Amino acid sequence: MKFINSILLKCTCAFSVIAMIHSCDNEFSEIGTGIVGTPDFEIQNRAYPIKTYNKRITPFESNKLEGNLLGFYHDPVFGGSSVSFVGQMTPRDYNPTFGTNTVLDSVILTIPYSSNASTLEDVTTFELDSLYGSSPIKLSVFKNDFLLRKYDPSAAIDGAQNYYSDGSLSSGQLIESSALESQLLYYNSSYFPSLESIELETYNEESEAFEVTNTLNPSFRVHLHNNSDFLSPPEGFWEDLFLSREEDAVIGAEDSFINYFRGLYFKAEPITETEGHMMQLDLLSNEASLVVYYTYDQIITVDGEEETSTVQGNYELTFSGNRVNIFENNFDPSILQTINDTSTDLEGDDYLYLKGGEGSMAVIELFSEDELGNSEEDYLNEFREIDGGQTTVRRLINEAFLEFYVEETLSNSDIPNRVYVYDLDNNIYVADYFFDQTVNTASADSKYTHLVPLSTETDSEGVQHKKYKVRLTEHLNSIILKDSTNVKLGIVVSSNVGAVNSRKLKDANEIEGIPSGTVLTPRSVILHGNNSPNSAKRPKLNIYYTEPNN
């Protein structure tokens, strides 16, 4: 709760500062339109030094994410990562009535994949928008026996229980695999998601034929009863678990239910250590469910006589409770040693290793001291003069942006299209993110002005070079015009730059939190740092400014 209150306070303060800066910026923009091109003013540009160094992303809060990863992903640079998850399930209806002479028909688990649809000439095709890798994995589904409690008994009243990506709780307790892996419900030794939609059929008694009545987007949809090919549970399991409990208090209310049936555990394992895939599941979809289908006897009166007919019923559960992702990494030891080496923090690293999930990130310090001894204050004084608390602008910033070049010989081929830069000291986005209203703030296809997608430039010899560009004009104006703190910035990979909700780190020492978009991708990229042996590709803070000709 303290963490949340802190973030809310920081956000409120940030918005206040942003509003003031924006007002000033509008005024300066109007001034700029009058001075550009006049003989008394000219636009110049200069690259200012920055310092960059690596940091490890330690275990983070992984419960109730916007999405849930599942699978195994092998990164040829970093190594392998397995991501499993455990999720609570609750019924849509408590105190169910199953009827008399109940007979189990089927049990079906459905979880949609995160996908995009396109239609051409009445034909709809799908693309999984968060599928990483192209090889099958081993996939198991278990009945979970570990209680995912809602509240932390060691915290203040109503303090939420935090669960972390290494399978631990805030108290330090570990989620034991023996509790997660109770009854095996499903096992596939070679699983890979299908891009095909799923047609649901219903039997039409009049036509005496099955008809398509509904179509689902591509989904993980499996039978968990009487399915010997995938090791479904023994006869009587589902009847004993639910259908025989009609008048039992354990399924009559939420608290008793989540203690009785503690959800499902999805375990992903590699078939080989160098192949696999990872995908994002949409557990918040209305279609994400476990449905127990059954028949029961219903007595009806026809022409004054009672008749018994067989009626179909269903008992549906959804993933409405806690959902926890658990990561298991097998990273290259030499890469980890480089990332964990803090001796380079003072001067900066040669290469920056960015990896999603429980991976790594980099810290950015603007206006770092150069070899001539110029300090942050020296650089800022080029743009302003402060006298008696009053700030006089010497140079008007027209545009400011960071450039990071990809180290293409070290990076793998599957690099992300976007990187995300945020205020590391306050664990919030920078002002430029707020003012960039391109598309939708919640969309992965947004913030193109601030966070420019991966681009390619061609040099004079025809050689292509990949780079990322991040605009920080508003952020720099805040520092110069409002004397705001020149905070440290963090740079991370992201599956969705619209997913900026912070996930608190378990060991929040230097890094307090990371955005959820970083959690939800296994991708990586290696960038040139400020001590790169290729000086032309070292990251730069480029500032275009207008100043009077004296």
Map each language-model feature to its residues.
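Secreted, disulfide-rich extracellular signaling modules
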Residues: 2-550
